A protein has these predicted regions:
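Hydrophobic anchor residue at the start of the ABC signature
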Residues: 143
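A short, proline-enriched helix->beta-strand linker immediately N-terminal to the Walker B motif
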Residues: 148-152
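Catalytic Walker B motif of ABC-type/P-loop ATPase nucleotide-binding domains
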Residues: 154-156
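Conserved ABC ATPase "signature" region
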Residues: 60-65, 108-125
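Conserved ABC ATPase signature
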Residues: 129-133, 137
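ABC-type ATPase nucleotide-binding domains, specifically the catalytic core motifs of the NBD
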Residues: 91, 95-110, 119
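ABC ATPase NBD coupling module
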Residues: 62-79, 103
Length: 156
């Protein structure tokens, strides 16, 4: 993943004005509580529209306020794992994992699903309801769902 980001966004009295370039690999944003890290992640994912800015992910412009470009979240190929884990309570772990695939109209790749399930140690949990999972298990299911969507960028 490579990203070019330049955004300006006001939330009440708070002004977020940031510009950075992230090359392929792992990039981390550090800062104190309230510094705007989550706001930046939400703008990258397309959940929040900044007042001004431009975002290029993997060479594709997903936001350019000057040109009226806004690619919606579901078309950004961005996987997002929220701070507060969000699973569908009426679905099994397996159905939660496959949700992103179904939303994108993809056919499930059994080998990739098995690889992610093994990687995250979810083999024995697939038929469980989220209400019967520990916090860590819920986090692993949410991460698996994001990974199975084969995102260009994974936002945690």
């Amino acid at each position: 993943m490579s990203a070019e980001v330049a955004i300006r966004h006001r939330q009440g009295a708070f002004l977020l004005d940031v510009a950075f370039t992230a090359g392929k690999g792992v990039t981390a944003l550090f800062g104190p509580s309230g510094a705007g890290k989550t706001s930046i992640v939400h703008v990258l994912a397309g959940l929040t529209r900044p007042d001004r800015g431009r975002i290029v992910l993997e060479g594709h412009t997903v936001l350019d306020t000057d040109k009226g470009v806004f690619v919606p979240p579901e078309k950004r190929r961005a996987g997002l794992v929220f701070q507060d884990v969000r699973l569908f309570p009426h679905m099994s772990v397996e159905t939660n994992l496959l949700f992103g695939w179904r939303r994108m109209g993809k056919r499930a790749d059994a080998a990739e699903i098995a690889r992610i399930v093994r990687l995250l140690g979810l083999e024995k949990l697939l038929q469980r309801s989220p209400k019967h999972l520990s916090g860590g298990e819920k986090s692993r299911v949410a991460l698996g769902r994001a990974l199975l969507a084969t995102p260009d960028i994974l936002l945690l």
